Amino acid sequence: MGNQRPIAVDLFAGVGGMTLGFEQAGFDVLASVEIDPIHCATHEYNFPMWAAICASVTNISGNDIRKRSKIGDREVDVVFGGPPCQGFSLMGKRAFDDPRNQLVSHFMRLVTELNAKYFVMENVKGLTLGEHRHFVDEVIENFEKNGYKILKPYQVLNASHFGVPQHRERLFLIGCRQDLTLPHYPSPITKPAKAKRIPKELVDLPDSPTVRDVIADLPDVSQYPELIKRDWCVADFPEPKSNYSEYLRGLRSDSADLSYPRDCDRSLLTSSIRTVHSQTCMERFSKTANGELEKISHFLKLDPDGICNTLRAGTPSNRGAFTAPRPIHPFMPRCITVREAARLHSYPDWFRFHSTKWHRFRQIGNSVPPLLARAVALKIMQILEVQVSKPEEVIQLNEDG
């Protein structure tokens, strides 16, 4: 699997948005730890060459991770992940020590047990606001006590500044061992298309891809009745409308993408099961202007010349299994499909999701857009001073639907 590629470990891996971003930057993510068996199975499908460890971080050690993957006794270059934020308790002065916040402490424990050179911890922007900042300060303080220095000031990164057609802000904490040099945060490469206010430091940057760029070349799902009962079919694809969609379809190479090529059937339209809306609902969707909220559902109708709002996950089954609002397609009277959401999140078309619609949208909404993860990973690759080339090995994906 190319030992010259730096080694990474993904904690709280989900379906693997960060795994893919780090792979694209040139890392071999030899182990990914995820407690949810549904996410784990999806991760295993998309990354069959590496170990997907279905376990809780609370019950696993760094040595376990080494033994259950191909890491063995090799040095781990980076550990990354996003401890779930739903359980954060911020009451009291020592929130870090609250048992309800144990997932962050276990993330830190595994970073130190693996003696990782670098770590990246991502989380919601809300942790940087108000009283929540004290919790972030405690996290930093505890990492420093455990022999790691932190890149300061910490930053919130917006996916739309890194070539993703979606407004999505996430906190990234980056650190390294005391004997190493800290990297820098990545600098924006795009500004959000059709944004009402552009910070002056972004004015001269090219626009991010637009909603139109992203989904206009996907087949019209209403023309495929088989998509009412299953999530894939053989389809006729129009010509790509942008470099972005051409890249996600696997028809255009990207010199910055050092991921393993995937061998899959490109005639398949996947993750595209149809939502059956009532006639009344479709009429409301049709009457809603692009870029406006539909008055009853409060769903946003996407502006084809702008970017997508933040795609959210909804709540897990132990918290009510509520579905997050899905945007309305800019040209058709329906909500967007999972594949369209995946495109808006920068997932390539070979990437598959769970067959149940609720799980699939949750998988996307919970994940870091791969292009955003790649931007962060490239800065760590840069500081490691490792030269990595595009692998020749092709990964076969199972195409049984």
Map each language-model feature to its residues.
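Short aromatic/basic micro-patch
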Residues: G82, Y118, C335-V338
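Core alpha/beta nucleotide-donor-binding catalytic domains of modification enzymes
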Residues: G2-N115, K125-L129, R133-D137, E144
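Short glycine-rich anion-binding loops that position phosphate/pyrophosphate groups of nucleotides
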Residues: P83-Q86, Q178-D179, P316
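Class I S-adenosyl-L-methionine
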Residues: D64-D73, M91-E292
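Short Gly/aromatic-enriched secondary-structure transition segments
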Residues: N46, P188-T190, A324-I328
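Short alpha-helical patches at coil-to-helix transitions and adjacent helical residues
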Residues: V15, R170, S208, N366-P370, ...
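C-terminal target-recognition/interaction regions appended to catalytic cores
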Residues: V234-G401
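Redox-cofactor binding/interface segments in oxidoreductases and associated redox assembly factors
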Residues: G81, M121, R312-A313
